[in-house]
């Protein structure tokens, strides 16, 4: 993912946690907030409680892939943070994908395809 489409700075994450809308589901938490850009930006966080670096990276890769597969269905102009939970590692791909779509629907991030 290009740097322009990722959230990297600490202040960006803090702002999202304080002022962004959130939805909690089985294996993840999604925070979102409208940005003034014409594209979405993504940040992914994994708690130290989940395990060591190999576990962190696996959870991060799974969330990044779920986002990539569904990015065409999302409205543009939002910053999003995906927070991995314990079930991120054990859930099936279908379950993880369904959870992501359900949380995005709850936050009204999915484009209306009428």
Regions found by a protein language model. Name each.
Residues 1-114:
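Positively charged, solvent-exposed patches that mediate nucleic-acid binding
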